[in-house]
């Protein structure tokens, strides 16, 4: 099988159920998800073989598969919607966010992306996720999409934030606090809401 088909040489690409321009919001959406998936591969390469990160490594690999599902779900434009991404994937992210938030030091101020190299990579993944989310929101204003994709991306950016903080904590590196930040987050044990 050849990697090239020449069918996209005039600026269009194939979807499940049709063709569209390569600069369409749909292609921009799943293209940004593909970019994110590639970047996670870089973070995985950085984590590879480092002790104490086996859970995160396994999760990132699972997320790569789920992002592939997101891209596939966004490429469906037929009446028959054989979506792959499930609400269980969203719930899993929520569980991990809660666990990582509990493990990391208490957050009191805004933080800057940074700390360890791997945490910095996860912060970049977070920002790419937010861009993908913005593209999907723009797409859903004009076309039907699998709405679980949007919920998943929204949780995923929070997951990357929490995971980056845990990577720093496990590495013995503190978060980089924004120097002009006041205390903006309340004590976890505070009864005030």
From Swiss-Prot:
Q: What is its main location?
A: cytoplasm
Gene3D superfamilies (alphabetical): Cobalamin adenosyltransferase-like
Record GO biological process: cobalamin biosynthetic process; porphyrin-containing compound biosynthetic process
Q: In which pathway does it act?
A: Cofactor biosynthesis; adenosylcobalamin biosynthesis; adenosylcobalamin from cob(II)yrinate a,c-diamide: step 2/7
Organism superkingdom = Bacteria
The record ties this protein, via Pfam families, to:
Cob_adeno_trans
Write down any Gene Ontology CC term: cytoplasm
Name the reaction it catalyses: 2 cob(II)yrinate a,c diamide + reduced [electron-transfer flavoprotein] + 2 ATP = 2 adenosylcob(III)yrinate a,c-diamide + 2 triphosphate + oxidized [electron-transfer flavoprotein] + 3 H(+); 2 cob(II)alamin + reduced [electron-transfer flavoprotein] + 2 ATP = 2 adenosylcob(III)alamin + 2 triphosphate + oxidized [electron-transfer flavoprotein] + 3 H(+)
Could you list this entry's UniProt keywords, alphabetically sorted.
Answer: ATP-binding, Cobalamin biosynthesis, Cytoplasm, Nucleotide-binding, Porphyrin biosynthesis, Transferase
Catalytic activity, EC:
2.5.1.17
| Chain sites annotated for binding ATP | 5-13, 22, 130-135, 154
Where does it reside? Cytoplasm
Q: Which PANTHER family match?
A: CORRINOID ADENOSYLTRANSFERASE, CORRINOID ADENOSYLTRANSFERASE MMAB
What this protein is called in its record is: Corrinoid adenosyltransferase
**The organism of origin for this protein:** Bacillus subtilis (strain 168)
| Gene name as annotated | yvqK
């Amino acid at each position: 099988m050849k990697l090239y088909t020449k069918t996209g040489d005039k600026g269009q690409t194939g979807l499940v159920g049709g063709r569209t321009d390569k600069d369409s919001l749909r292609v921009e959406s799943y293209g940004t998800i593909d970019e994110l998936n590639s970047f996670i591969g870089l973070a995985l390469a950085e984590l590879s073989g480092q002790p104490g990160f086996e859970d995160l490594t396994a999760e990132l690999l699972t997320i790569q598969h789920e992002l592939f599902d997101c891209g596939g779900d966004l490429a469906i434009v037929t009446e028959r919607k054989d979506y792959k991404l499930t609400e269980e994937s969203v719930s899993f992210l929520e569980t991990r966010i809660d666990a990582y938030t509990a493990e990391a030091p208490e957050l009191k101020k805004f933080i800057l992306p940074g700390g360890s190299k791997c945490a910095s990579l996860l912060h970049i993944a977070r920002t790419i996720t937010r861009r993908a989310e913005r593209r999907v929101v723009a797409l859903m204003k004009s076309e039907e999409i699998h709405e679980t994709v949007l919920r998943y991306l929204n949780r995923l950016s929070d997951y990357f934030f929490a995971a980056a903080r845990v990577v720093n904590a496990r590495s013995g590196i503190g978060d980089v606090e924004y120097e002009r930040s006041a205390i903006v987050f309340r004590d976890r044990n505070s009864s005030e809401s």
